[in-house]
């Protein structure tokens, strides 16, 4: 993903056909090491293709993928209820710890 992001950044910046060296330079400028195999595969697959056209095709493909609907909503509500109960239990435990922390000694006594 990082290789593709650097490639697209170069393309949007005006470089119509970024090379592996260009992508590697972008990645190293932010402290990321480039994976040679993945980078070479990406460059070979995208060579000669228009970035704007690729983005448009990808958007069409994403729009055609079903999103799942309301099936996951009921599971999320149950998980949220469990998280609230855990938070209450943690608060009670934290209160105990706070009372034990002082142990009768003040910081500035």
Curated annotation (Swiss-Prot):
It comes from the Eukaryota. GO terms for molecular function: structural constituent of ribosome. One of its GO terms (biological process) is cytoplasmic translational elongation. Keywords: Allergen, Phosphoprotein, Ribonucleoprotein, Ribosomal protein. This is Large ribosomal subunit protein P2. Residues 68-79 have a biased composition (Gly residues). Belongs to the eukaryotic ribosomal protein P1/P2 family. P1 and P2 exist as dimers at the large ribosomal subunit. The modification Phosphoserine is found at residue 99. GO terms for cellular component: cytosolic large ribosomal subunit. Residues 91-103 have a biased composition (Acidic residues). Coiled coil: none annotated. InterPro entries: P1/P2_N_sf, Ribosomal_P1/P2, Ribosomal_P2. Plays an important role in the elongation step of protein synthesis. It comes from Fusarium culmorum. Residues 63-109 are annotated as: Disordered.
């Amino acid at each position: 993903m990082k290789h593709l992001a650097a490639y697209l950044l170069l393309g949007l910046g005006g470089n119509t056909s970024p090379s592996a060296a260009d992508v590697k330079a972008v990645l190293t400028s932010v402290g990321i090491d480039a994976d040679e195999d993945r980078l070479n595969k990406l460059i070979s697959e995208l060579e000669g293709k228009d970035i704007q056209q690729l983005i448009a095709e990808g958007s069409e493909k994403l729009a055609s993928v079903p999103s799942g609907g309301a099936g996951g909503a009921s599971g999320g509500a149950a998980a949220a209820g469990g998280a609230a109960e855990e938070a209450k239990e943690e608060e009670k435990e934290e209160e105990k710890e706070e009372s034990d922390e002082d142990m009768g000694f003040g910081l500035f006594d």
